[in-house]
Amino acid sequence: MKILGKYKGKLGEIAIWESEQTGDRYYREGEVFQSQSSASGESRFPYVKMMEAFLGDTNSVLLLGCGGGNLATMLARQGKSVTVVDHNPVSFDLAKRFFGLPKEVPCFVADFKEYLLAETRSFDGIAIDVGGPGFCFEEQFDPATCHSIIARLKPSGCAILNMLVATDFDAAPDMISSDLSEGHMTSWIFDHPGRLNRNVLIACLPKLRRAANRHYMAKFSKTVGCGWTLRRPRRPSRGSTSSVVDIACMS
């Protein structure tokens, strides 16, 4: 591995690494690898590829969170209209310089919650992949923020959120999923039960398309990698004690 550059980020030092064996590139902020991709920007993370697949039928997509910009790059290359928001301006420069993010993709430097409140456009899809050292998902995705996300979707729109979960005892995915299911949306959780410090995806679709949603989720579930499970959220109240998450494996 060799270091292509080091930069000052808002949450710690950002380092860009490159594998001399494979050519893959890595975006590391603080102690966390935010992105891993080919030199052309194709993500190596399974969850990013799942987010890309989930947004396959969309035309306009709002991405909250940049990192190496892999998801934005992959969607833009499909001809989608992509808008990216991140609080760290250096992320956009690094995504374009090292990870192939097209220069024409609109990038906005802003706190994602403030951006949602100010934005007036509606989108076919919204993807959320934010985080970093000290980030608390339960605090950041409170009911008001979840409402702001859904408010920026078209009536037929969909949303998908990536979050980090420490253990099966973490109730945050269920709380956030329940809040995202208010109003006209419904949600599912993709998880890796039993793993520590894992990625969890929350996928949201319009409630009124129940039959179409079941068909879509069943079809989408068959495309995901080994080990992922699909379930509906439980409804713990905020402030409740954590409980073991009941997971049902996909067939």
List each model region and its residues.
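General small-molecule cofactor/ligand-binding pocket signal
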Residues: 17, 106-108, 188-190
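Conserved S-adenosyl-L-methionine
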Residues: 184-195
